Swiss-Prot record:
One of its GO terms (biological process) is methylation. The keyword Magnesium does not apply. Transmembrane segments: none annotated. Keywords: Methyltransferase, S-adenosyl-L-methionine, Transferase. It comes from Shigella dysenteriae serotype 1 (strain Sd197). InterPro entries: DNA_methylase_N6_adenine_CS (IPR002052), HemK-like (IPR004556), Ribosome_uL3_MTase (IPR017127), SAM-dependent_MTases_sf (IPR029063), Small_mtfrase_dom (IPR007848). Its EC number is 2.1.1.298. The lineage of its organism: Bacteria, Pseudomonadati, Pseudomonadota, Gammaproteobacteria, Enterobacterales. This is Ribosomal protein uL3 glutamine methyltransferase. It catalyses: L-glutaminyl-[ribosomal protein uL3] + S-adenosyl-L-methionine = N(5)-methyl-L-glutaminyl-[ribosomal protein uL3] + S-adenosyl-L-homocysteine + H(+). The keyword S-adenosyl-L-methionine applies.
């Protein structure tokens, strides 16, 4: 977008609605990739324009006719240009993302929240757990969104938020503090289970890196802005998942459950471990590649993952 084009937008567009319409047009024309919390240009525009004005996403419709100042228009136009030209996800431009109805701070130290596990949390893992969990582990916590959402869903529970990345934990700690949950959610630095005490969890939830080498090489440019540490997991995408499967049983209570997301790498997992009774979960709001195993099932399958035990 050249300077004349930018000046035209700033000079002629006047209202929030104008900026939303213009952003939708720019996104549609640029054929950008949607995959960081939206799947269409309108939602993408809403999540860029309104946070850029420090407004909530659900403003009254009549407020969209409010006129904007020159500095507000410049801010929006600049971010739209960066979204189109640099393919930066909107969440990194606004430092805002949403998960389970809660707002989170994000930047390029963490992945943008988008896991279908959010639907399970909203439903309080109905049909998957036998009792209210008192101790929950969020492994590979990243921004802390899953851990924090679990703390809202189960306010009596203690939630441990584990990650190997100090950068990710810094973001998680910021979100924990902003949500007022410093007594409920405990950030812990650990290489998966390796540095954890032998705590017995009622529920382990994990969205580890699971992108295989082939998919990593073909990712849309938007994903290049995310930390590779949070995406890549070896040739078949299961490098970390195998370690989780080899160790999780030691950290689960007798009636505990493991919920793990592996995305497209579910194909490799099913092919390589046909005797493991993975329960593949279905979602009303889209998404797949999330399985459940009980402690009993993990113990029965332990021989398959013995070499990955810490």
């Amino acid at each position: 977008m050249d300077k004349i084009f930018v000046d035209e937008a700033v000079n002629e567009l006047q209202t929030i609605q104008d900026m939303l319409r213009w952003s939708v047009s720019r996104f549609s024309a640029a054929n950008i990739w949607y995959g960081h919390g939206t799947d269409n240009p309108w939602d993408e525009a809403v999540q860029l324009v309104l946070p850029s004005l420090y407004l909530p996403l659900d403003i009254p419709e009549d407020m969209r006719t409010a006129r904007l100042t020159s500095s507000e228009k410049h801010r929006i136009v600049e971010r739209v240009i960066r979204r189109v030209n640099e393919r930066i996800p909107v969440a990194y431009l606004t430092n805002k993302a949403w998960f389970c109805g809660h707002e989170f701070y994000v930047d390029e130290r963490v992945l943008v929240p988008r896991s279908p596990i959010g639907e399970l949390i909203n439903n309080k893992f109905a049909g998957l757990i036998s009792k209210q969990p008192q101790h929950i582990l969020d492994m590979c916590t990243g921004s802390g969104c899953i851990a924090i959402a679990c703390a809202y869903a189960f306010p009596e529970a203690e939630v441990d938020a584990v990650d190997i990345s100090p950068d990710a934990l810094a973001v998680a700690e910021q979100n924990i503090e902003e949500h007022g949950l410093i007594h409920n959610v405990i950030p812990i630095r650990s290489d998966l289970f390796r540095d954890l005490p032998k705590v017995q969890y009622d529920l382990i939830v994990t969205n580890p890196p699971y992108v295989d080498a082939e998919d990593m090489s073909d990712l849309p440019n938007e994903y290049r802005h995310e930390p590779e540490l949070g995406l890549a997991s070896g040739t078949d995408g299961l490098k970390l998942t195998r370690r989780i499967l080899g160790n999780a049983a030691d950290y689960l209570a007798d009636d505990g459950v493991l919920i793990c997301e592996v995305g497209n790498s579910m194909v490799h997992l099913m092919e390589q471990y046909p005797d493991v009774p993975f329960t593949w979960l279905e979602f009303d709001n889209g998404g797949d590649g999330v399985f459940m195993l009980t402690k009993e099932q993990l113990l029965a399958a332990r021989e398959h993952f013995a070499i990955y035990k810490d």
